[in-house]
């Protein structure tokens, strides 16, 4: 049983699922769902369509260069059945999957390192610019008065300390 890759989104196409388009030059295109097939017929570029794996890899959102990705390559050479080889392969697949998940986590952490601080800055800036939208006008006036009173109290305290 061979699991093919969708030509458009690079998702898995299981046997008996999806659509296959064969061009006049015998080039085969497999699609996992009608969404991919329609986008292909509309001549859309998978690298410019935001939800495809091609876009994600091109824009640095997924790992592109890693040794664990080479285990997924398509191999056309048939191998004689050997029970021990199959068992070793299954064990290796599990080990490779764990390594791949660990590397993907670190890749994601490195990618998201400065994002939280940047988002917080943007939110605070937006709040300061649109303060009148958050609070009603009467509450805003009271808040401004309270800020002025606090500023006056601070000035009085500093002047009394200087005089003594």
Swiss-Prot record:
Residues annotated as transmembrane: none
GO biological process entries: ribosomal large subunit biogenesis
Keywords from the UniProt entry: Cytoplasm, Nucleus, Ribosome biogenesis
GO cellular component, one term: nucleolus
Gene3D superfamilies the record matches: Ribosomal protein L24e
MF annotations from Gene Ontology: structural constituent of ribosome
Compartment annotation: Cytoplasm; Nucleus
Classification via CDD domains: Ribosomal_L24e_L24 (cd00472)
SMART domains the UniProt entry points to: TRASH
Subunit structure, interactors included: Associated with nucleolar and cytoplasmic pre-60S particles. At the end of biogenesis it dissociates from cytoplasmic pre-60S particles and is likely to be exchanged for its ribosomal homolog, RPL24.
Homology family: Belongs to the eukaryotic ribosomal protein eL24 family.
Job description of the protein: Involved in the biogenesis of the 60S ribosomal subunit. Ensures the docking of nog1 to pre-60S particles. Activates and recruits ATPase AFG2 to cytoplasmic pre-60S ribosomal particles.
Protein's UniProt name: Probable ribosome biogenesis protein RLP24
Organism (species): Dictyostelium discoideum (Social amoeba)
Chain's gene name: rlp24
């Amino acid at each position: 049983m061979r699991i093919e890759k969708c030509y458009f989104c690079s998702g898995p196409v299981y046997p008996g699922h999806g659509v296959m388009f064969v061009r006049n030059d015998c080039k085969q295109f497999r699609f996992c769902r009608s969404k991919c097939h329609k986008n292909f017929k509309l001549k859309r570029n998978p690298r410019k369509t935001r939800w495809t794996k091609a876009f994600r890899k091109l824009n640095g959102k997924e790992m592109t260069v890693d040794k664990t990705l080479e285990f997924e390559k398509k191999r056309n050479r048939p191998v004689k059945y050997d029970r021990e080889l199959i068992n070793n392969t299954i064990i290796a697949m599990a080990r490779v999957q764990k390594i791949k998940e660990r590397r993907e986590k670190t890749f994601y952490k490195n990618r998201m390192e400065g994002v939280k601080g940047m988002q917080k800055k943007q939110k605070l800036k937006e709040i300061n610019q649109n303060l009148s939208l958050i609070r009603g006008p009467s509450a805003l006036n009271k808040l401004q008065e309270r800020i002025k009173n606090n500023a006056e109290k601070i000035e009085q305290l500093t002047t009394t300390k200087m005089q003594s």
